[in-house]
């Protein structure tokens, strides 16, 4: 959460960030509910909100460099741009969707897309870090 959240909060301010979290929470669980309308399985967690923060972050800071650990037999540290990281993360969510999983990929994808679009439509300035 704080890898991306603190930067988004700094940009939006505490009040707007709190409102953003509530909106993305409702929208991400809404996507999950629409896709799984007849399911009786409860959903617990805030991963849709975290995904929304990631969507907001990649819109605001697409060129920010992230230090990541890539598994090539051992963990290999490298830096990549935020948009590249988010691209691979988003693709991983689609692969989760293809398999049978107890992970709410619908909330992840919905949260990410709504987070990205909410910030984009709010016309916040992008930063080229």
Regions of interest found by a model, annotated:
Residues 1-129:
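A detector for small-residue-rich transmembrane helices and their helix-helix packing motifs
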């Amino acid at each position: 959460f704080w890898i991306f959240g603190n930067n988004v909060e700094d940009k939006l301010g505490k009040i707007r960030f709190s409102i953003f979290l509530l909106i993305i929470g409702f929208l991400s669980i809404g996507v999950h509910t629409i896709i799984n309308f007849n399911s009786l399985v409860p959903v617990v967690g805030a991963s849709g909100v975290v995904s929304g923060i990631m969507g907001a972050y990649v819109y605001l800071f697409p060129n920010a460099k992230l230090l990541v650990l890539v598994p090539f037999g051992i963990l290999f540290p490298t830096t990549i741009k935020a948009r590249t990281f988010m691209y691979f993360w988003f693709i991983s969510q689609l692969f989760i969707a293809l398999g049978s999983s107890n992970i709410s990929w619908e909330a992840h994808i919905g949260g990410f897309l709504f987070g990205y679009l909410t910030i984009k439509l709010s016309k916040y300035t992008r930063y080229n870090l």
